[in-house]
Curated annotation (Swiss-Prot):
Its EC number is 2.4.2.18. It is an enzyme of class 2 (transferase). The gene is trpD. Mg(2+) 2 binds at D226, E227. This is Anthranilate phosphoribosyltransferase. One of its GO terms (biological process) is L-tryptophan biosynthetic process. Pathway: Amino-acid biosynthesis; L-tryptophan biosynthesis; L-tryptophan from chorismate: step 2/5.
Amino acid sequence: MNIKDALALVVNGKDLSVEQMTDVMREVMTGKATDAQRGAFLVALRIKSETLDEITGAAKVMRELATKVVVNADNLVDTCGTGGDGANLFNVSTASAFVVAAAGGHVAKHGNRSVSSSTGSADVLEAAGVNLQMPADQVARAIETIGVGFMFAPAHHSAMKHAIGPRKELGLRTIFNMLGPMTNPAGVKNQVIGVFTKALCRPMAEVLGRLGSEHVLVVHSEDGLDELSIAAPSHVAEYHKGNVTEYTLSPADVGIEMQSLEGLGVATAEESLALINGAFAGSDEPAAQKAAAIIALNAGAAIYVSGLATSFKDGVAMAEDALATGAAREKLKELVEFSAL
């Protein structure tokens, strides 16, 4: 199916099959469609609401066209979010990656520069001194030897260049906001994904199950974060062993004290890095203590889905240990040094 035929269906409220969506996305991602067609298609899909089949088909094409990172490691996991929650918190999922590595996991962190927030994962890692342009084989070695590596999305999804213009000009959330976390170049099968609305939790968990994932938590907090929050309960859709289970999780359920988010907002990558460094150093500043708590909560989730812990609560305890010993700080230092080689 070509994009013109697909547009005719979608604008009339008709859904596309997985096969039809893969045909159209290949036109979008290979430059065959015009900017006008790409923009119209993205908006029409958004207005109609994307179905599981459409999201699945689009994700398949992005995965197919990605520059792969082949990693030989157990417990491979990713921590990421869709962004777009408007909270402007420091980079929680990025910080969590180093804690998971310090606990013995292997994190294939996939991310980009900021689109809607103050700072994206790439921005804060660059501020820390990480070389974002590492080739795929070096990223794989980092994951295997250090336990964490960063895959800069534009370097691995070059086909995205065909969608950048329309996305920027539209200024709207589109299907691409969902696709980023579902198209990890290392093919991770265990993930913690934060989303900007509760309505996405179950659909994304179901799509990832269709795409071969093993253990996934898709989360959205009641105070609006695309993370697990320390200030409110969070909605969780957990995919594991072929089933999706939905539940509400309070920080206290896994041993984290409920507390406000005051002091965790940032305006720049440097401010985000300062909070992360404070948390990693065990600072007794109130903001650093809160940062450590929300990092431990989210890292604990990733440790759990990676298989390193048998329960979410045990994962959080392992994350707290990794922070307390300074091991997480060492992992960040190791990645900075390794990326400069």
